[in-house]
Amino acid sequence: MSDFIFTSESVTEGHPDKICDQISDAVLDALLTEDPESRVACETVVNTGLCLLTGEITSKAKVDYIKLVRNVIKEIGYEGYKAGGFDANSCAVLVALDEQSPDISQGVNEADDVNDDLEDNTGAGDQGIMFGYACDETPELMPLPISLAHRLAIQLAKVRHENLLNYLLPDGKTQVSIDYEKGLPVSINTILISTQHNPEIDGLTNEEEIRQRIKEDLWKHVVIPATEDLEIKPNIIKTRFLVNPTGKFVVGGPQGDAGLTGRKIIVDTYGGYARHGGGAFSGKDPTKVDRSAAYAARYVAKSIVKAKLAKKAEVQLSYAIGVAKPISILVDTFDTGVISQANLTELIKKYFDLRPAAIIKEFDLRNLPQKMGGKFFRKTASYGHFGRRDLDLPWEKVEEKAAQLAEASKVFL
């Protein structure tokens, strides 16, 4: 199938599920900042007037969880007249956190394949499969649909925070459909933006008039700025532009829908363009391979594409709880590779150390929250963990590895 339309979505930081991801990662940041060896599996639930923290945590850090939760909600924008039934200052915050299971801790602390190599002594925190992906559709080596959906969501939140469109409220979603011909992106077929808003805008009360006003404002202040540097741009005549298709979006956030950590895993990764192992990221410390190994898989895939050894690459890793080395490594270049997939796998095993402790050390995952002033993982909890132009993410820095792969691959050419 070479001619098709592919669609991906993103959501803003005010989406109920994303509120939860940010709170869970804010907890992780706070704990790692004080105690880099913290073991964290923090889940968050939000509903009208309620936030619940649950999960398992083992740490020497002392954190005021209630204050932290309220601060995150406030920074997102749920406060005062914009709260919509979920006010940072008055919502109930319940904390129900246990310690990590000693059975899990034992497997992480001392791997099954223990030896004199320190990196072999830390086992994976769970079994599982993780995928990483990269392609040459964008400068950041991400699929265009998810990249553009994130751009729109980021810009939508920006104009709200800057009060450029003072009727906007925190909840929102974007969706982008891209036309592909011969497997390459050629045009933007459809842009959809659903954004929460005040019931009245500058004296307008008619539902259709309000929707038309929002549509005009979003094209000017969101769509155009978010796409101005792209080679493929939206066309006001040819690109279908949908805004709040139900007519209005006044009730939103946790008042409209309950939220839960880990329910936007496709938004967090590749927008459905590549496979996903099923494990969420937010609220998990780096010993959880759901997170750290997914970052490593992206690192490997991006290095391959950056080295021009393939136009697209998907890497699968698998782990067993308590075992340091990956059970399997699989790479697929979708018939775009310049060397065989077997040879690529050989290079991956030689140039990438994919044991959990080695990944943590390579990316400095335990210490980044402290180095970044207590906010690192939380920033990844909205608008994707990969291809972020606005964040300094270690798994996106592939120049050195790409150069190594490019040089080493010459023996196979």
Curated annotation (Swiss-Prot):
Pfam families: S-AdoMet_synt_C, S-AdoMet_synt_M, S-AdoMet_synt_N. It catalyses: L-methionine + ATP + H2O = S-adenosyl-L-methionine + phosphate + diphosphate. Mg(2+) binds at residue 17. Binds 2 divalent ions per subunit. Binds 1 potassium ion per subunit. It is found in: Cytoplasm. InterPro entries: ADOMET_SYNTHASE_CS (IPR022631), S-AdoMet_synt_C (IPR022630), S-AdoMet_synt_central (IPR022629), S-AdoMet_synt_N (IPR022628), S-AdoMet_synthetase (IPR002133), S-AdoMet_synthetase_sfam (IPR022636). One of its GO terms (cellular component) is cytoplasm. The keyword Protein biosynthesis does not apply. Its EC number is 2.5.1.6. PROSITE patterns: ADOMET_SYNTHASE_1 (PS00376), ADOMET_SYNTHASE_2 (PS00377). K(+) binds at residue 43. Residues 100-110 are annotated as: Flexible loop. Its main location: cytoplasm. Belongs to the AdoMet synthase family. Homotetramer; dimer of dimers. This is S-adenosylmethionine synthase. It comes from Prochlorococcus marinus (strain MIT 9215).
